[in-house]
Each structure stands twice: as C-alpha cells, then as structure tokens.
Amino acid sequence: MSETLATDATTPAEKKDFIRQIVREDLASGKHTVIRTRFPPEPNGYLHIGHAKAICLDFGLAAEFGGLCNLRLDDTNPAKEDPEFAAAIQDDVRWLGYDWAQLRHASDYFEVYYLAAQKLIRDGHAFVCDLSAEQVRQYRGTLTEPGRHSPFRERSVEENLDLFQRMRAGEFPDGARTLRAKIDMASGNINLRDPALYRIKHVEHQNTGNAWPIYPMYDFAHSLGDAVEGITHSLCTLEFEDHRPLYDWCVDKVDLVGHPELLQPLLDKGLPREAAKPRQIEFSRLNINYTVMSKRKLTALVEEQLVDGWDDPRMYTLQGLRRRGYTPAAMRLFVERVGISKQNSLIDFSVLEGCLREDLDAAAARRMAVIDPLKLVLTNLPEGHTETLQFSNHPKDESFGTREVPFARVLWIEREDFAEVPPKGWKRLVPGGEIRLRGAGIARVDEVIKNADGDIVALRGWLDPESRPGMEGANRKVKGTIHWVSAAHAVEAEIRLYDRLFSVEKPDDESEGKTYRDYLNPESKRNVRGYVEPSAALAAPEQAFQFERTGYFVADSRDHSASTPVFNRSVTLRDAWAK
C-alpha cells in the first residue's frame, strides 16, 4: 500500500488529553515535523473492543496531526499465528473507518533484528545462555531478592557470536539456548534482569517458511520495529509501563539511527530507510463491565462452544460486535467518550449501548416487526380487504423518503400489547378498549378467542372508518398507539434477541470460588419466530433498522436472505439493565 496520510473517519473538536498535548509540544518545538504512529497487533486471535480504543487512538492521532500510521502485524511467534487472523485484523481496521500508510510485518525485519543482536554481542551487551527456562526462573530472583548472574554470562564475544550463528543455523533443539541481554540482575524492575532477546523455535513461519529456527522476543522486536519504521510516538497500554526501560535500552544500545548499515536488509527488499528514535507512551486500557477481554478466556468460550464462534453477536470481538449491529460510528463515538488517561477505570456497558442508540436513532430507517405475534381480525372490513399505506422511513429525517406498507383485514400485533385483565396504568389494548393502529386508524377489541387450554389465540375487533389517515376522526384521542403487520403480506423471520453475555458486572471476579463460566447469562440469546413487513425482508445483510417500539435490529451478515430473513437485536430502545 502506498504511503498516504492517515484519514480519520471523524472531525471532532480539538481534544485535550495528555497524549495529544505531548504531540502538540513535539511539533511546536520542532522535535518532529511529521507524526508517525503504528497499530501492532499479533495475528493470533480476533481483535476485541479493547483494541478499538488503540486503533482509534493510533490512526486518529496520526490523522488529526497530518501524520502517518502503519499497521504492523507482530508475527514473531509463528506457533500461535494464522493468516485468518491477519486478514480479520485488516478487515476490522478498515471497518472502523481507517486505512494504513503501510502494511508491515515484524518478519519483514528479521534480518535487521539478527544484525542488531550481533551488534549487541560485539558491544558486550548480550550473551548466549544455556540455562533452561526453569533455571532462568530460579536465577531471576524475586521482587524482594536480587537475581543471580547466569554462569554463561561471561562468555567471550567470539564464543557468543559463534553460538548465536549456530543457533541461527538450526544446530540446537528448541529451548537449548537463548540470547539474553546483559543489563542488571539486581534491578528492582524484573524486566531488566538479563531478559531473553531470542529463543530457539523450529516452527514454520507463515511468511518466511523454515528460514528461521530462532525468533526475537516481543520486547526486542517491538522496540526495534518502532525504530525501523521511524515511529515518533509508540502508544501502548499501562501494563507495558514497566517494559519501557527495556524498550529504551534496546533502542539506545542498538542505535539504528547511528548505525544505518544495520538497515541494509530493508534497502535490499526495497523498503525505505526511516529509522528514528521512538518514544513509548502508556495510556489506560479499556475495561468494560459485564465483559471479559482476556484472549485466553475468549478462546475458551469459543473452544468450549459456550458461544457460536468468534463472530457470535454476544462476543466482544470486533467481528462479533459488527455482526450484532454495532456501527463504526458508534464505536468511534464510544472511544471518544471514554477518553484517554493514565487512570484505569471500569466503563459501564450502557455507555457503549448508548452510543449505538444515538447513532442508529439518526442512521436507521424505521420498519414494523412483530416479535410475539397475536392475530387481530378487523371484522368490519370485507374478506380479502387489502390497501397500501404510505409510511415515513424516518420521523426525524425526510431525506429517508417513504415506503408502501400493506394493510389488511387480518393483522399481527404484539401479544404483550393486549391484556385481558389490565394492570393499573395500562395504555394498550383491552376488551372493549380502543387503540391507535400505527398509521392505519383506531381499532377496538370486541371478542377474545381462546383455545381449549384457555390460551388467547386471536382477537376480533372493529376499525373505526372515520379514523383513517387524513380523516378528521384520525386525530381522536386514545390512550396509546401500537404497531402491526399485515398477516397476509408479512414475511416470517427468525429474530435473535441478544443480550449481555454475562449476568454480573465483574465476571472476572473469582473471589467467591467461581469463574466467568459461572456467570454466563442464560438469557443472552433467544431465538423467536416473528413477522416483518415486506420491505424489511428485502434488507441487505448488515442493514440496520429500528423496529418500531421494539429496538434496533440488523440483518444477519451470515444467515439473512429475502426468503429467510434473520435479524439480530443490536440494542433495546432503552437501557433494560438500568438500576
């Protein structure tokens, strides 16, 4: 992809968070003339809502300041990575409304990393260690006790270079040796206690095949990847704050800016020379109640078939949220409202739902659908009576136009809109009572039909002929208005009523001996058969509607068709979880 300026999907008012203030100061002082950021996910799973915050920040920041943002796939652990995940990541970024200046892979820089590691060895900053993983843990020490030097720490430069070259040649089995940095085994920051820079893994790589039996560790590859790409502001969440000293150590000791010869493999590949010294800046991660965002736990939900795959609309993956009906605009609005800070906090899920309601209230056309149908026969209309009514597609926006809705003698209405024995304050249908049928006139119930078990199966009533649209009687006051669909014309649809996957605010809380599995909400998905007006059935996959008086729904991206409509409830009209 050609190097183009990042384009933000929104043009918000100037934001005042601490990261943007740093960027403004860096530009004003002349420290940087062009801002460069990157979004560097590992392609070992699907992105979740927490990644949306990072995406919007990385790409949005570059766009706001006329800079560039790369998408870099951190493919340094091939045993857990898959091209399927890499493709999904790219799809998710574009879905959110962003595009990258360049698509890069950490594997593009494997030769640079190798040369950098050799430089560290020559400079006396790295050594090949023969300790096993368990022995390394024993030597590392604790938070209160310093670590001990590896017995292999004082190998000569020549021996280290030879062993590292033989590691590269594939002479040794997995786990036999590592390349470690020489930093400080007494440091209070355990990340600085001679961390591993390379490990042996005889695993085929998706991009490089079997060319490399050794792979760089995350901290080494991540910091140098930023330096290689000339990233000015490397943004990450607070859990990496303790890694920043190691990040800076790698950048400073390798010094790609001062040693351009290390970048020759990039030039050989036709990649530009852009090296610079990056600055890591940490911000709070996104934590939302009623969710889990651990990749391990999300994977378990899928593998244990507790959900219907990574794009299950109850999942907090971007693929799942998209299938649920969440929009890019709602996601960006949510990130903007959450804001950027250094203080971890728990965001209420209702904030996310509110952003979706706000977006769809403006963006979604209206349709009528009946979720739990009850038949209403208007006996004063002739058998076979059918007419066409004109309905506005959006009560607040004339640009949405109008549509034709068939009206007939037999209708489906919501079962919950009738009460044989109404509670106090009831404003819908009752025996002998009147109600306004949305856009059609005023109806009265005269007879309740029951089956042998005493269940209500139908209502028989009367439509006031003087209350039809355009007539003076149409303005007659009645207690309420209900929606309906014509029984003869409506299309039967599968309607999936989704709700929050977990029933408690903190499903990660295991203080009572329970796990997140114990808090799964049994009502998180209900499949019902209902009826939608004909124009709704013709929706394209992922087309959103407000089903009047019911909620916001989206045509399912996988299963929906005009002949077999499937709609997912994205969000209710009001917060059903409000306390």
Curated annotation (Swiss-Prot):
Disulfide bonds: none annotated. The keyword Ligase applies. L-glutamine binds at residues 74, 218. The keyword Cell wall biogenesis/degradation does not apply. One of its GO terms (cellular component) is cytosol. It catalyses: tRNA(Gln) + L-glutamine + ATP = L-glutaminyl-tRNA(Gln) + AMP + diphosphate. PROSITE patterns: AA_TRNA_LIGASE_I. ATP binds at residues 42-44, 48-54, 237, 285-286, 293-295. Coiled coil: none annotated. It is an enzyme of class 6 (ligase). Monomer. Belongs to the class-I aminoacyl-tRNA synthetase family. This is Glutamine--tRNA ligase. It comes from Xanthomonas oryzae pv. oryzae (strain KACC10331 / KXO85). The lineage of its organism: Bacteria, Pseudomonadati, Pseudomonadota, Gammaproteobacteria, Lysobacterales.
